[in-house]
Amino acid sequence: MCVRVLTSDVSSTESANMRIQTFKRVSLKALLMMPFLAFNLGQASDTNFAPKAQLVIDKVYAIVGPLGQRSVANAGLNANYGFVITENGVILIDSGASAHSAAMLEKAVAEVTKQPVRWVLNTGSQDHRWLGNDYFARKGAQVHALAATVQTQKASAEQQVSGMARFVGDQMKGTSPRQADVVHPGAEVTLQLGGIQFQWIDTSAHYPGDTMIHLPQKSVTFTGDLVYVDRLLGVLPQSNVRKANQAFERLRALSPALVVPGHGQVTNLAKAQKETGDYYQFLIANIGVAARNLDSMSETLDKFASPLQFKHLQNFEELHRGNMNRVFVDFEANP
């Protein structure tokens, strides 16, 4: 199925309405497949990726994936993961893109502790966040997710498995999409696992049901795909920059000392603000406002094509114009 990105000018209310209707006719299946169709972000840094745990703070670790596209070389682990070591076992944050890549994450954990993975928490519903669930569940781990996350996982499972197979091929063998054993209702949950407290907060930023996980005792937040650093974030058709901006304000209120972003190196809140929070605000204040004013789409995209504060980010040239396009169409349809 071909998904067309709209670029025509807005010269009248009639043409604006036609574009809105075209946008609304894009099927759910096409939207769920959009990450595979839209972006080609391969890079040399993917080559021979082996997950390695890096200490964030006492007993809390991050596994930082490469910034490029899913590939055989990175086993679909082009995202960030994390884990917390407790006396009762390991709490893993996100399970990987397949049974194969889940085993790679398990190996990275085993390099720093003999404790088994007892719990898995899914921060989101993109393939590399949860398609390793079954691997860990079959080994006795208890998988947790918020209800909204599970809903999106169920809707996208079939398309994500076939889509990931196009990138990693035979590495998908033995992978079964499996949702959480423990599903938590509501937009915010407080959990106590292995003596560690977790504040689990819905963001619905990059994907519906995306979340962030805050560890108040450690002053660390695993943001999921709310925050990107070192590379430009991607706005998908199902992304919601207004919710993302609100969720980022909640992150600011949590005021973590350390941030483990969805993509990019472990960082602090100031850098997360500069490379993600400011970009959400840029899109809303400039592209969103122009759409509400029924300004010309093409003129708006040209006007804001080269914001200096974001041009240094990897993937800027590939993603920025498409991001603006989707935000314009969204605000035009939902002013």
Model-identified regions with their sequence ranges:
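Bacterial N-terminal signal peptides that target proteins for export
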Residues: 19-31
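Bacterial N-terminal signal peptides
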Residues: 29-40
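Metallo-beta-lactamase
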Residues: 45-56, 89-91, 97-99, 151-282, ...
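Conserved beta-strand hairpin/beta-sheet module of binuclear metal-dependent hydrolase folds
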Residues: 58-108, 213-215, 219-224
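Active-site neighborhood of phospho(di)ester-bond hydrolases with catalytic His/Asp-centered motifs
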Residues: 93-95, 118-126, 144-147, 222-224, ...
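Active-site HxH/HxHxD metal-binding segment of metal-dependent hydrolases
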Residues: 107-186
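Accessory terminal helices/loops
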Residues: 253-258, 266-335
